[in-house]
């Protein structure tokens, strides 16, 4: 009997493969970074070939390092950076342009022209706010600006995919062109009520329906990995979820009202809203969490574009630390931020502000400011952005938050988690397994093939590592929040003409 599930976790800065056993324990991890390209101000691109080659490499490397054979692999699950957009020639498999990354802002002005007339309609159909973040305007840009792309599309020879779709296309040698609702719901072309691609939205963005993948559930067999990549050609690809929805599932937030925050490149807070779509009055997004069988689960989401990535900037741009981990020890040498506030909106503000023209701001600097104050303000800036989303979410659901679960690379920082708990004045719960995004994809794949019988069996595997409880006096929190709000106002509309 097969003993393992492999999760392919394709992220914004690296491709990873993680092998899990039946207990949900990590057997092996392989990871490779790949470059991001910034050809113009506000543009962010990846090479589709680099995404595929690094993902294939880490999958094969993980299998080799774990010394397992193809018959030991029960299935593969895929989780991915969402919204990132690729178009390729169906006949040759060659991309017609680079992958336009979710962080890319080139279509901001175009999105602005649509907001007044179409904003309400798009919000009602998709649960999303018109923004360059989502795939629709990126597809439109490629079709309008890349020579030959529109002609290929009209002939039916062009394929669109988010990263999950591209990887499955490559793994199956072009035999399978699919996605799942968690990814489709991030394109701004998918109606989350009918669970179908929406003809009115496709017409608005002038996108031919023929280029789109088939939308299947998040947990079923889509196809098999070609024997060129795993010998035998019998390993099923059986689970798909966008990274944030996968983390919600991996955290076993499977009951209505449960929430998690992922501290990755960005920060993404999701609350399970069950089988009901909660329409936000506070600039949050309604999205599909997953679909298993015929049952659709929805979520309320708030995301900030720069979370853990700001620590990379402090390391590589500001150069006041040599390693990302060093920010914790540096920040811990001071008791507070010394009046310094860092709003790390380098690529604009996401929820709940949705300001495409905001830019990163460090404010409150004096002659007494040190690198340690800036380090602490960096960690606080991450936590305070998350605070603003939680307060918006509480208004939408009419309930106060008592705790939430955390994951992602930066959640390993005890100092950041303590700051987060202090600002919230409620408990932060960190699980033993932080690889919850990959674990969610593994669980979805395993459920499809009977590796696990149901979510109740899986839920028993979730284990708490530690809980962070608030230590900061409420009056000090109020002071921090007052100045944080002033700093946010300073960062807003910075480059608006």
Curated annotation (Swiss-Prot):
<feature type="binding site">
    <location>
        <position position="265"/>
    </location>
    <ligand>
        <name>ADP</name>
    </ligand>
</feature>
<dbReference type="InterPro" id="IPR000577">
    <property type="entry name" value="Carb_kinase_FGGY"/>
</dbReference>
<dbReference type="GO" id="GO:0019563">
    <property type="term" value="P:glycerol catabolic process"/>
</dbReference>
<dbReference type="GO" id="GO:0006071">
    <property type="term" value="P:glycerol metabolic process"/>
</dbReference>
<feature type="binding site">
    <location>
        <position position="409"/>
    </location>
    <ligand>
        <name>ADP</name>
    </ligand>
</feature>
<keyword id="KW-0418">Kinase</keyword>
<feature type="binding site">
    <location>
        <position position="308"/>
    </location>
    <ligand>
        <name>ADP</name>
    </ligand>
</feature>
<feature type="binding site">
    <location>
        <position position="83"/>
    </location>
    <ligand>
        <name>glycerol</name>
    </ligand>
</feature>
<feature type="binding site">
    <location>
        <position position="14"/>
    </location>
    <ligand>
        <name>ATP</name>
    </ligand>
</feature>
<feature type="binding site">
    <location>
        <position position="133"/>
    </location>
    <ligand>
        <name>glycerol</name>
    </ligand>
</feature>
<dbReference type="GO" id="GO:0006072">
    <property type="term" value="P:glycerol-3-phosphate metabolic process"/>
</dbReference>
<feature type="binding site">
    <location>
        <position position="265"/>
    </location>
    <ligand>
        <name>ATP</name>
    </ligand>
</feature>
<feature type="binding site">
    <location>
        <position position="243"/>
    </location>
    <ligand>
        <name>glycerol</name>
    </ligand>
</feature>
<feature type="binding site">
    <location>
        <position position="13"/>
    </location>
    <ligand>
        <name>ATP</name>
    </ligand>
</feature>
<comment type="function">
    <text>Key enzyme in the regulation of glycerol uptake and metabolism. Catalyzes the phosphorylation of glycerol to yield sn-glycerol 3-phosphate.</text>
</comment>
<keyword id="KW-0319">Glycerol metabolism</keyword>
<keyword id="KW-0808">Transferase</keyword>
<dbReference type="Pfam" id="PF02782">
    <property type="entry name" value="FGGY_C"/>
</dbReference>
<dbReference type="InterPro" id="IPR018485">
    <property type="entry name" value="FGGY_C"/>
</dbReference>
<feature type="binding site">
    <location>
        <position position="82"/>
    </location>
    <ligand>
        <name>glycerol</name>
    </ligand>
</feature>
<feature type="binding site">
    <location>
        <position position="308"/>
    </location>
    <ligand>
        <name>ATP</name>
    </ligand>
</feature>
<dbReference type="Pfam" id="PF00370">
    <property type="entry name" value="FGGY_N"/>
</dbReference>
<comment type="similarity">
    <text>Belongs to the FGGY kinase family.</text>
</comment>
<dbReference type="GO" id="GO:0005829">
    <property type="term" value="C:cytosol"/>
</dbReference>
<feature type="binding site">
    <location>
        <position position="12"/>
    </location>
    <ligand>
        <name>ADP</name>
    </ligand>
</feature>
<feature type="binding site">
    <location>
        <position position="243"/>
    </location>
    <ligand>
        <name>sn-glycerol 3-phosphate</name>
    </ligand>
</feature>
<feature type="binding site">
    <location>
        <position position="12"/>
    </location>
    <ligand>
        <name>sn-glycerol 3-phosphate</name>
    </ligand>
</feature>
<dbReference type="GO" id="GO:0004370">
    <property type="term" value="F:glycerol kinase activity"/>
</dbReference>
<feature type="binding site">
    <location>
        <position position="409"/>
    </location>
    <ligand>
        <name>ATP</name>
    </ligand>
</feature>
<keyword id="KW-0547">Nucleotide-binding</keyword>
<dbReference type="InterPro" id="IPR043129">
    <property type="entry name" value="ATPase_NBD"/>
</dbReference>
<feature type="binding site">
    <location>
        <position position="82"/>
    </location>
    <ligand>
        <name>sn-glycerol 3-phosphate</name>
    </ligand>
</feature>
<feature type="binding site">
    <location>
        <position position="83"/>
    </location>
    <ligand>
        <name>sn-glycerol 3-phosphate</name>
    </ligand>
</feature>
<comment type="pathway">
    <text>Polyol metabolism; glycerol degradation via glycerol kinase pathway; sn-glycerol 3-phosphate from glycerol: step 1/1.</text>
</comment>
<protein>
    <recommendedName>
        <fullName>Glycerol kinase</fullName>
        <ecNumber>2.7.1.30</ecNumber>
    </recommendedName>
</protein>
<dbReference type="InterPro" id="IPR018484">
    <property type="entry name" value="FGGY_N"/>
</dbReference>
<feature type="binding site">
    <location>
        <position position="12"/>
    </location>
    <ligand>
        <name>ATP</name>
    </ligand>
</feature>
<feature type="binding site">
    <location>
        <position position="16"/>
    </location>
    <ligand>
        <name>ADP</name>
    </ligand>
</feature>
<keyword id="KW-0067">ATP-binding</keyword>
<feature type="binding site">
    <location>
        <position position="244"/>
    </location>
    <ligand>
        <name>glycerol</name>
    </ligand>
</feature>
<dbReference type="InterPro" id="IPR018483">
    <property type="entry name" value="Carb_kinase_FGGY_CS"/>
</dbReference>
<dbReference type="InterPro" id="IPR005999">
    <property type="entry name" value="Glycerol_kin"/>
</dbReference>
